[in-house]
C-alpha cells in the first residue's frame, strides 16, 4: 500500500563487506538518509537500541523486527529481511491481519487528515497519491470500499514499485482492480508480500544503500522493451519474434550496451545471436559461457530470457570499471531465438552453438509466407556461416544461466533466489478420443460413448498422479470438441498432453501410467483413441560441481538455500548436451507469473542475482589460479 525509498538487496554486499566476493557491487546512499546505520552496529547494539534502530519498518508493529533480532548476528541485510519474513510467517493469521489492518488505506482518510506515519506520507507522496484529480480520488475511494467490503482488510500495495521509483496512479488503480477479484487466501498472502517489499525499501533507507547494479539491469530491460513487433506495439504489448525489425533493433541495442560495458569483442553472428567476449588475463585460457534469449512470446514479459543476458553484462561492466581480468574469459550470448514463435524452430540460437541448426528450418514459412532463409537474407545474415557458429566445448569451463523463475514457488516462500537442480524432461502428445455423437436428450447416461467425459476422467487422473511425485507436472493445455453442439453428446474430443519430470526415468514412469490409464478408460467406456508424440526432450540435471557453486554463492549472501527443478525449458538444456551447466532462478512478483505483461521482479532481487553471479566468478578465479 505505501512504501519508502529506493530499495536494495544490494545492502547485502555492504553488510557482509564482500568477504566472500572480491568484485564489489557498488551502491550509493539515498539522499533521504543522513546517518545510515551499519549491520555491525545493529549486531553489536544492546537489544533495546537495536530495536530502536529498526523502528518504523512495519507500520505500528515493532514486534516483528524485535523478534527478528533473536537471529543476530546477521550476515547481511538479506539475512535480516528473511528473518523478519519468518517472524511474520509463523505469527499466525490473527497477528498477520492485525499488521495489515494497521496500515492506512491508499489516498484514504489518514492521508486526508494528515495522520499518516512519516514513512507512509513519503511513500504515498512519491506515488502521486497526494495529488489525485477528483476523479482519481473518487475511483480510489470506491476501490478501497469495495476491497474492504470483500476481504475485511485494507488493500496493501508497495507503491514505490519494483525499482523503488514509484508506480504511477494508473498502475496503482490497475493493480487495485485486478486484485479485487482474487481469492481471500491469496490476497492475504499478497498483502503480506507487499508489506515485506515496503519494509525492504524502508530498511535500505535506514542502511543507506541502493541496488545500483540491480537498477542497471532493470533499466536495460525497460529500455529493450521499447522495441516490439507491429500491431503489438500499438497496443502497448511486448512481442519480439525472430528477425523482425524490433528483433534486429534489440540485437543492435544489446550490442551497443555490450561495447559500453567493456567487452573486448562484440558481434552479431550468422543466426542473430549477439556475442560479447571479455578476454582472460592471459591468452589461451578457457571461457565461461553464459547468456539467455532476447526474443519473446506474443504479449509477453520483459524479464524472460533477458535477465540472463543483462546480469552477466553488469558483472563484466564492473570488472571493466575496476580494470580487472580473470584467469578465464567470459562469453555472454544473447540468443536470438528460443521461443519458437515466428518459425517452428525452438532453441534456434543455442542450438546453433552446439551444431544443432537444422537446415530444413531455412525453408519454413511464417504466417506471411516468408521463409526463414529470406528473413535471414533480409537481416544481412549469411546462412553459409551458420556451421561456423558451433563451439568447441574443450574451450569452455561450462555454461551457467540466470532466469526469472516463471513460477510461484519462490514468491510464495519469500526467498529471492533458487538454485536449479534439473531442467525437467518432457514429452508432448496430440491425442483424440473417438466415441459416438448422439442426441443429448434421448441417449441414457449408461449408454453414452462420450469422448469428452473420457478426457475429463483422464485429466483428473493426471492431476492426482503427477501430484504423487511432488515435482512432476501433467497438463492438458488444449481441449476441443470438433463441431460440438449444445444438444449433442460429444463423439470426438481432441486434446494435448504435456508431461514433465526432473529425470527421464521419472518422466517415463509418468508417461507409462498416463497411457495405461488412457487405455483403461477407453476400454471401459467403449471408445477408442489415437496419440501422436510431437516432442520429447531429455531432462538436464545440473552438473553437481556447478550447482554447488551456485549454492555457495547464495549461502554467502545470507539468503536461505532453496533448491527446485525447472519445469520450463531453457537454453541451458541445449548447452547441457555438450558441456556442464547449472541455473539460478530469481523470484518473480505477481505470483511468479510469466509469458505475461505482469511478469516482474525487483531491483533488489536482481542485485542479489548479480552478487551471486559475482561470487561464482570469484570462486572460479580461486579454482583456476
What residue spans do the PLM features occupy?
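Zn-dependent metallopeptidase/amidohydrolase metal-coordination segment
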Residues: 227-230, 291-292, 561-612
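Midchain, well-structured core segments that form catalytic/ion-binding scaffolds
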Residues: 337-338, 342-504
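Aromatic-anchored, charged helix-turn/loop surface patch used as a conserved interaction hotspot
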Residues: 41-44, 52, 56-58, 63-143, ...
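Acidic/His- and Gly-rich active-site-bordering loop/insert found
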Residues: 214-301
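A short beta-alpha structural unit
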Residues: 238-243, 475-484, 496-498, 502-503, ...
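Alpha-helical metal-binding/catalytic segments enriched in His/Glu/Asp
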Residues: 290-293, 299-339, 427-433, 439-465, ...
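His/Asp/Glu-rich mid-to-C-terminal helical/loop segments that flank catalytic regions of hydrolases
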Residues: 421, 439, 443-468, 511, ...
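Short, low-complexity intrinsically disordered segments enriched in A/P/G/S/L with frequent Arg
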Residues: 4-8, 15-19, 27-30
